[in-house]
């Protein structure tokens, strides 16, 4: 479990790291683009390298990512059934957003074939307590964790 992939972005309340790079566009994938905002090279950012190294070391059967604010369960790679099981346990619909350039979803789901779902939580959760978030989304999260992999 990696509680925060972008600690600098969390503190600054932005999706970009200290170098101004969107880490969720910095992974090696056929659809990746070399730009200042996505990184001038794949895995140019230490945070993305850490995630890749963790994937190499632990070889996860499934990846569960939590984002905001698109209000859905997205998936990449062989994860459609998992996404549907998760959505049955919360108020978020399954919505295939497509493989974003150099995203963790593109890398894990399409390049490595690891099922990945993304809880895209609603954007209006600023005043929701942790207890209420857990009450609202724990059944879905637990369903994802319990889902039979491979």
PLM region spans:
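Active-site-adjacent mobile loop/cap segments within catalytic or ligand-binding domains
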Residues: 24, 75, 101-150
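Active-site/substrate-binding loop(s) of hydrolase catalytic cores
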Residues: 1-98, 121
